Amino acid sequence: MAGAHVKYRHLSRSSAHRQALLRNLVTSLIKNETIHTTYPKAKEAQRLAEKLITLSKRDTETARRSAQGILYTPDQLLPKLFGEIRERYANRPGGYTRVLRTEPKDQYSQAPSAILELVDGPKDMRFAMTAATVARDREQKTESTDLTKKNMDKVTRFRKDGMRAFEDMVASLRDMKFTAGAINPKEWKKLDR
């Protein structure tokens, strides 16, 4: 049927293979809170991850069984999903994940790649980058741009003790005394996120 509306990305796989791929990506996302994959896979996995977190917020027996059918290791991840992650997103109406475009993963595969991450978590990339920008602005004694202020509001709005955690991160980054926005990757490990 030519010209039909595409409801989802097929990812050049059979239906069973595609479902297995997405379940594996979502299981890794819940386990590690961030994954690096291709952009189309990240966007499709994002849809399934959002549904899974919405199920965890319902916290019913039916929701637990549905989540158990999605995750590959439910015995390990259901307590995390229905505990820590459900509490983190209790007040957030949606948008539990974020897709950030990145450079291709290696020089041989030029497929567009992306990072899929859970927002407001300990590995939130936008939170860290916004804090680094604010720390740089304060170090250089310049006013933050409107975009930086908007991002600051976004990353702290639904986070528990958001502004306090953000200011702690900014203080940690200022103590590193980085120059021109460049931070040694070894210094990131010293941050207590």
Swiss-Prot record:
It is found in: Mitochondrion. SUPFAM superfamilies: Prokaryotic ribosomal protein L17. InterPro entries: Ribosomal_bL17 (IPR000456), Ribosomal_bL17_CS (IPR047859), Ribosomal_bL17_sf (IPR036373). One of its GO terms (biological process) is translation. GO terms for cellular component: mitochondrial large ribosomal subunit. GO terms for molecular function: structural constituent of ribosome. Keywords: Mitochondrion, Ribonucleoprotein, Ribosomal protein. It holds the Pfam family Ribosomal_L17. Belongs to the bacterial ribosomal protein bL17 family. This is Large ribosomal subunit protein bL17m. It comes from Neurospora crassa (strain ATCC 24698 / 74-OR23-1A / CBS 708.71 / DSM 1257 / FGSC 987).
